[in-house]
Amino acid sequence: KNNENGDTAVDHYHRYEEDIELMANINLNSYRFSLAWTRIIPDGIGKINPKGIDFYSRLIDKCLEKNIEPFITLYHWDLPQSLQDKGGWANRDMTNIFADYSEAVVKNFGDRCNHFITFNEPAVFTIYGYVDGYMAPGYKDLEKYFASIHNVNLAHGKAFQAMKSLNNNIKIGCSFNMAPCIPATKSSEDLHATKLFDTYWNRSFADPMYLGKYPELLIDDVSKHIQQDDMKTIFQKNDFIGLNHYQHYRIKADNNNLLKARGAVNDELPFGLEDKDTKLTLMGWEIVPDAYY
């Protein structure tokens, strides 16, 4: 309509000052925002873009001026294309590249920012990107998926070490989109499907990062990617955990009914969603106010 599009969107890049003024007016005391990797290092590796550093510095300074604590997320799914061309998160080299990027972030912002989140919802961009192909890079490849799980976990550990080596006083964690998993019935098939879904959605990253081990149902699939001392690197003394929550999932055993509309995975993973006559958001998420508890 009227040739309108979403290119400009909220225009936070140009209007961040008034946005932060609005935050201050409603007494927000923190602001979690995500860095664009390409804005800081356009090619993913190598030369740093001073204009990108300048923008985030001004954003951070404005937050601090208004007594708003900045919480920086390093990665929110926008991988530089040059790195995807090298294999993306299925490539183990990404673990060192991400650590270098995280180091650049702390060198430039660690003097003013105390809280850093390595990844936002890693289960989303790995499942959607490497299993059902809904998101970039659009693969339907379980082997790449399992490789990406381990590489993201390892990248978190290496980034943690790199950032702490520069400033041991900063706080570092990871943010997950956890969801209660409810079996559709008490049948053994549905119970097993629910355990599988819980493994992939809730535990494939939280368990290695915060417990130091992969879930039992995942270990065989990722074991070929684990090298000596990897698990020690992954299991750091994280300072906090971030939890995002949207809905719960009703799980049933089903090789064909996939989570196309409201979730993820393809027919190679044997579970699906049970359809219920319940209220949904416009994004198709079930409205369950008590699911977070």
Locate predicted features.
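Active-site region of glycoside hydrolase catalytic domains
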Residues: K1, A24, D43-I45, D54-Y293
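N-terminal structural segment of carbohydrate-active enzymes
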Residues: K1-N49, I53, L59-E65
